[in-house]
A protein has these predicted regions:
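Type-3 copper protein
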Residues: 1-202, 402-404, 408-411, 416, ...
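Long C-terminal appendages of very large multidomain proteins
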Residues: 181-427
């Protein structure tokens, strides 16, 4: 992910226990429920768009071959740019519609520093705006929000002096399925049992080839014994034959207006979106972005939950301090830049040339120089419309409640897996 910065990981469990009271959980459930309702709509809409695109590919292959039964390989190859490649028109279309809907639910004043809503006043709007008839595939019943608590101490939380902060919301994904979280879990067998109960229908899970662009530590390993494992080529040692689906044994055909993938011997058949479900989940996992970036976006809170940090979006080529030749001038101009936009000292910056946001302390010449280098790289690589998004650091330095025995503070988040109780049929 980062060149030269991820050579070694230490995946371990810390000797600490955290218990969350019902009062705290109840304060989170209402606002988080609104976000999860919109996530269901997003996954459903993605499924519908991809269903249409896959049907178009199927019809083109039928016209080319003259047969209504099509091998899975050519369809997969033509669909791959939409699924895991650079063709983003379907992603952009659905994300744009999602953001437009949220702009109808809440009103953002770009001149305001923060906007506050209650879940009670938004509940009806969200239900009407994000009505979804069903979930499109089994794994889309999972959504995984990462939630932080901003508070100066545990005692402050007990006194009610805290707020929740939404880090990310991973759509159509169970983030507990990642290899380190399963291996470090105190009872991994409970995880496997839970997923078997949650998802009663078997899924189709692709076997990752050795050259897959997925870090081994991020690979999903939480599968039900009833799931089918899809293998291309010869890369499927150790898989029970009854659960193995060689790609060479699969074809696609239509039944009415629906597409299905089946084995050549007619033993197994899957709805086309259910078949591609695991791939779709990986495609849309990071598409939950409530609002289109604006020059200035206020902090947005629903009850105690901050769903959008205050942020600024600036064209990379217009950030003058990044192009100053002398360190002193660069540092001075960076402070002027921060003052002009009324940014806090501690921020995270998202630049086109990095996968993840980077931390910046505007009072540090070292951090300013590192940010300037990233901005120049973004401009030099001629990224079309390259913009830098700056977000407030929340929780802040004094809002890290988790301490060790020596009083050192640590950042932390609660990784939540929410299960949609609607099956992948009518909701």
């Amino acid at each position: 992910m980062y060149a030269g910065r991820t050579l070694v990981y230490e995946d371990c469990r810390r000797d600490v226990e955290v218990e969350i009271g019902t009062d705290v959980l109840e304060g989170l459930s209402e606002p988080l429920g609104l976000l999860l309702e919109s996530a269901r709509w997003m996954a459903w809409r993605f499924g519908e768009e991809y269903r249409g695109a896959l049907h178009e590919i199927y019809l083109s292959l039928v016209r080319k071959s003259g047969s209504t039964v099509v091998d899975i390989e050519p369809l997969w190859l033509q669909a791959e740019p939409l699924l895991i490649g650079s063709e983003r028109r379907l992603l952009d279309k659905v994300r744009g519609a999602f953001q437009q809907k949220w702009s109808e639910v809440v009103s953002l004043n770009p001149d305001a520093r923060s906007v506050q809503y209650s879940s009670a006043e938004l509940r009806g709007r969200v239900a009407a705006t994000f009505a979804a008839p069903r979930t499109e595939w089994s794994a889309a019943r999972y959504h995984s929000p990462d939630v932080m608590i901003a508070a100066e101490s545990v005692d402050a939380i007990r006194r009610g002096q805290y707020c929740f902060v939404l880090g990310e919301l991973h759509v159509a994904t169970n983030t507990m399925s990642a290899a380190p979280l399963v291996s470090q879990h105190p009872s991994p067998e409970d995880l496997f049992q839970a997923i078997a109960v949650d998802l009663r229908r078997p899924r189709v899970v692709p076997v990752l080839p050795k050259n897959a662009p997925v870090p081994r530590r991020a690979a999903p390993v939480l599968c039900s014994p009833e799931d089918f494992l899809l293998a291309f080529g010869d890369g499927a040692p150790g898989i029970p034959p009854a659960r193995l689906l060689p790609a060479s044994a699969l074809v696609v055909e239509a039944s009415g207006s629906d597409l299905f993938v089946r084995t050549r011997d007619h033993q197994h058949r899957f709805d086309i979106i259910e078949f591609f479900g695991s791939v779709l989940s990986g495609t849309i996992i990071d598409q939950f972005q409530l609002f289109e970036p604006m020059e200035h976006t206020p902090r947005v809170s629903i009850d105690r939950l901050v769903v959008q940090r205050e942020s600024w979006s600036v064209p990379a080529s217009e950030i003058a301090f990044a192009f100053e030749r002398l360190d002193a001038d660069r540092f001075l101009e960076a402070r002027r830049f921060r003052q002009q936009h009324q940014m806090p000292r501690h921020v995270f910056c998202k630049v086109p040339v990095e996968v993840k946001p980077v931390y910046v302390d505007f009072d540090s010449a070292i951090y300013v120089n590192l940010l300037a280098k990233l901005i120049r790289r973004s401009v030099e690589e001629d990224r079309e419309g390259a913009r830098v998004t700056v977000s407030e650091m929340l929780p802040g330095m004094q809002e890290l409640w988790l301490e060790d025995g020596e009083g050192q503070r640590y950042t932390s988040e609660f990784r939540i897996v929410a299960l949609d109780l609607c099956e992948a049929t009518e909701c």
